[in-house]
């Protein structure tokens, strides 16, 4: 107090602070030494230091969260699988422990065959519809009778989800509830509003599900007169199957209602729900049926080879026809994002690299090794000729096996391959693609497996891949240095190939891909107010982090997958501020399970990353 300080012979010392408005309890003091004031104001006077500027530390906000699939949640009210309503308990726990984000895997309907193969959450039959497995049955009109309770207890007692039984019984009980409550529900104002707001995707989805069940396949190319979507034809079908159509609408209405309730609950408790946006769509989906012109149905999305897959990855999804999408201002994307924003306040873009360029694989190929980037700037035949590679005779674009190569790939089966699969040193047309090879040798016995894998490796053995949409233009094959085609090059040509390969994969496309992303991503980001996070793992061009920073998209940092070459574990202290950091992805073991996988690796993490000495605990507890 200034008056109490008078006459004490000391200068008046002070500091700025932030205090609670009601209790005046200090919350944060400014940094640095005390400020001094030699001459104090008199009684009833006030002093103002207009030049003073508080030195509060720049504390950047940081938040903690939990990532978990909805299907992994467990409560007594479940029916053998985690449900939307289970998120309420998770929200309570997150709020009580100071967390602010809950991230889930994709929640769209993946029902294709009614088998466990449908359980993969990244292969949805619709990018708008929700998966019926997440519904709380009693809240959708299912009676909790003895049959229901017996089934619920039996399914909940299982150590793992019985995907087929859970979904079969849920749909059966929902059918029964629909017969009892469907007409009354359809008369409700909120139901009518839901139908009106979602008709553009809901009615085609309901027709798709009905046709799928009627024909026994989600492959719409096998639906005869319905193989090509025609609105008038489908509308007539819906009228003649109105009860089935109404059932699927009934289920989606209840899923929407339940998830909307959970979202409101999360927001009321200060918890952000973060969704997951898959990069691809299924080629047997409502979206592909309605809008085939928006996708390259003759191609497959995947990934180049990496430490986890020597032949690359083939996800099977058709790739996007971005040029066609741009004509209507990316309307399909904007509608998809708007639907997602009804439930989520943040989202993760799965494989954000796909918005810069996607790894595209022809449908005749199986291995990711035979893919190429799209969009890209492939070399023209003239460019390659100028670098010493004449593509006209096919020696660099088709396999040319010699005796040494056949022996290396097939061993004692080399003679059989030469006699049955080849003519004049080239593969016969019946074995000219990997899909044909897979169809010829589908068995799992050793003989068929060796022939199949050997022939596929033989088909991988090329240096260039011709662009399927630009004849006379060629992409260097990814990771070619172990191929026989590369090893057969003389020293001069090998050096020339190395130069063009390095330029192609590390320099030629940087600005080109950045411009490509900047035409698409801002449209997505402006469609909603969701916080955008990108999964930017893998083979990352320099332009990707630059663009993400420019567009304020958070990066993903995985401690066990460091982005700096030579690091075993990433150091969180060096992560960018605008990032999501975690110990692992959903494709990897969580921390406690990983701890017990490799004791030597765990010891290095314990001693080097955590900086703790002594014996390593056997369990991560």
What is the role of each PLM region?
Residues 2-12:
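Short, small-residue-biased leader/transition segments that mark boundaries at the very start
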Residues 4, 31-32:
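Intrinsic disorder/low-complexity segments enriched in polar/small residues
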Residues 19-31:
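Short acidic/polar inter-strand loop motif in beta-rich domains
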Residues 25, 33-621:
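Catalytic cores of glycan-processing enzymes that make or break glycosidic bonds
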